[in-house]
Amino acid sequence: MKKTILIVANLDTRGSEFKMVKELIESRGHHALLLDFSMEQEPFFPGDITCEEVAREGGIDDIEEVRQLYRTKRTLATENQITGAIKIVSRLLKEGKLHGVLGVGGGTSTLVSTSIMQSLPFGMPKLMASSMAGHPKYVDKYVGTKDITMLNTVVDVVELNPILEIQLINAVGAICGMVEISPGWEIVFEKPVIAVTSFGFAERAVEPAIHFLREKGFIPVPCHAQGRGDRAMDELIREGWFQGVIDIVSRGIGEELLGGNCAAGNDRLLAASESGIPQVVAPSGLDMLSIGGRPELLNNYKDRPQALIDKLRIEARTSPEELEQMAEIIADRLNCSSAPCAVLIPLKGWSSLDKEGLALYDPEADAFFTSVLKKRLNPNIPVKEVDLHLNTPEFGREAVDLFNKIYKKNQTGS
């Protein structure tokens, strides 16, 4: 079946490169749609969607004004073309005229292309062939929490040469393969899909929970709560991919509050609360703060009990005062939930690092957290305390049983 692949291009500085890419896609039997966001000068040839069209959609009627901005306030020119391109691509998506996106280029092209890609839904094939793909600090911004595939061109995307041609061929092969085999991004599942937050310090609870969910007729999807993973989960919740959450590892709240390595944004828990899906929340990860590789944090927490996992992963114990703030945040965000929710608290420790005899064990601090949470939560939100350690299969079963109860309540409205 013939598919439409959008090529994001700057045809004023790259001509032969995009001509080759377009011809390669068409040789595979697909429609190649060139979107030109040129800002600097006249393009070598016009795109299927011209830079003038992109400029107008961004809010500037005259492309010469964009070119003037590019010379004096380049950021504003770039932002205009990104805005215009996103509007055009959004329409193509709604009209069913878009099946994949390919970007090719250096710094500016990568920024524009990935900004467009970040506006698209999960599952839409997105490939960025970039000379910036080997730059870790930039890639973090280009990809964010989206399912964008980066291909390192190794050499710069400036005029065709044997090495660049190999990478362009590979890029076309990759995006064509994606659109040919992709099941699409509007999949209807026969069973409810449930997000389960996870990390290594709670895996003995998470893995059994996944098994128990399957037994009860759900489709579990583990989400790695390392900051990016829980942000991605929240975005997928807002896109409608999940019908419930078992949030065993809520660590992103504390990491965000205290500036740790695994900060998950200032709206953790709110996606589920505002989307009207049931959620069970447990406190795994709130007992620690990830400070590895951060001299300022290592210094600030030097007097705290610490667990050294490896040279990058150092976990410091959180204090009662910090846990009090976390409890208040969690309570406030659950209080605004439009669907049933519950909290599940283990009494014998919250992670594999938080148990008797280990550095992060502090049952008094954990108990203080629970007392603050209970006082601040709405009385209709249950807090179930269980005489278990969190990192056990038994806790995983408790989490699933509690979730199943509130899920049914949400379904029946009673």
Regions found by a protein language model. Give the residues of each.
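Cap/lid and interdomain-hinge subdomains that line or gate substrate/regulatory clefts
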Residues: 67-73, 136-201, 325, 332, ...
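N-terminal phosphate-binding or glycine-rich loops at protein starts, especially the Walker A/P-loop
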Residues: 1-43, 100, 109-119, 123-128
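Gly/Ser/Thr-rich loops at beta-strand to alpha-helix junctions
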Residues: 10-16, 99, 103-113, 133, ...
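Short Gly/Thr/Asp-enriched flexible loops that form oxyanion-binding sites at enzyme active sites
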Residues: 103-122, 206-209, 355-362
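Short, acidic/small-residue loops that bind anionic groups at enzyme active sites
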Residues: 100, 112-142, 149-152, 221-225, ...
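Phosphate/nucleotide-donor binding subsite
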Residues: 46-97
